[in-house]
């Protein structure tokens, strides 16, 4: 995958009542932790995986996030929630 993006019809939101991040899809709602939501916000079809990792590394100085980002994007791809924009 070169430039991940959310599948058409999916959108991220924060539910203030439940105090949780959610990925809204036509089939329902996927609950997300804050880290997953932050990664998926960067999956806009414009950024490469390296760009996403770089943006997060800049926010969290010294953290090695590459494996975690790749694992999340892969899991979301397998579920059909993230696709390649390329």
Which stretches of residues belong to each language-model region?
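Acidic, low-complexity/disordered tracts enriched in E/D and polar residues
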Residues: 1-41, 85
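Long, charge-rich, low-complexity alpha-helical segments
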Residues: 28-86
């Amino acid at each position: 995958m070169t430039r991940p993006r959310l599948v058409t019809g999916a959108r991220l939101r924060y539910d203030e009542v439940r105090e949780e991040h959610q990925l809204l899809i036509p089939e329902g709602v996927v609950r997300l932790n804050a880290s997953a939501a932050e990664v998926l916000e960067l999956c806009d079809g414009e950024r490469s995986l390296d760009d996403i990792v770089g943006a997060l590394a800049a926010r969290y100085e010294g953290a090695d996030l590459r494996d975690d980002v790749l694992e999340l994007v892969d899991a979301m791809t397998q579920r059909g929630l993230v696709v390649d924009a390329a």
